[in-house]
């Protein structure tokens, strides 16, 4: 690829939005074409680079994708489930690819976005960090070797501002393990415990959630048997790891046909056996 990929970023003034703007500035393969914020924001017209603390980028914050329709090829969206569905619909109507890092979707919203994959290229992933996507491969191996003989728990922690729980990454961890073991996560997941719960059912996958301070993201899968336990952990120390993954996804996505893709495909991990 010789030409830069032009991207637009929604939620440009938020914590993740500003990190995405910074990542775009640092990536030689990316050109920031637009930064979108909610209508009525006091930040309209502010230079996106100045807002992100990386110096002027000559891209003013705007409140409409329509105003920026000619300025980008890939939309990068880390907003809310409701907003992401609206943004994906807009992309489908305007022939734009989209990278979605939003989490907290319900089943119907996931189905809506999946349907748009018939019209445009979409990367949708609950976590775009390279290490997390490698962790999912490791979980397949651990589940295959140990899953039927031990207790499985998933523990995740995030900052106090995160709105959904468990995190999309934690749920994906559970899905990977359950699928490897031939289980249905909707039937075997246990979300938190309280009171007299009785003896643990080995066929379940437990989830525990921490929300505190400024934790960027920590995820651990615990495979515990009598006499030993295996812990597979990923800790993110900066949102930049997610932002860099999104930029990588954008540069990959412009070369793809319409379809719904994930970061495993972006990173070439599909079909790899560890």
From Swiss-Prot:
One of its GO terms (biological process) is diaminopimelate biosynthetic process. NADP(+) binds at residue 38. Signal peptide: none annotated. Transmembrane segments: none annotated. It comes from the Bacteria. Gene3D superfamilies: Dihydrodipicolinate Reductase, domain 2 (3.30.360.10), NAD(P)-binding Rossmann-like Domain (3.40.50.720). GO terms for molecular function: 4-hydroxy-tetrahydrodipicolinate reductase; NAD binding; NADP binding; oxidoreductase activity, acting on CH or CH2 groups, NAD or NADP as acceptor. It is an enzyme of class 1 (oxidoreductase). Pfam families: DapB_C (PF05173), DapB_N (PF01113). (S)-2,3,4,5-tetrahydrodipicolinate binds at residues 159, 168-169. PANTHER family: 4-HYDROXY-TETRAHYDRODIPICOLINATE REDUCTASE 1, CHLOROPLASTIC-RELATED, DIHYDRODIPICOLINATE REDUCTASE. Catalyzes the conversion of 4-hydroxy-tetrahydrodipicolinate (HTPA) to tetrahydrodipicolinate. This is 4-hydroxy-tetrahydrodipicolinate reductase. It comes from Shewanella pealeana (strain ATCC 700345 / ANG-SQ1). The gene is dapB.
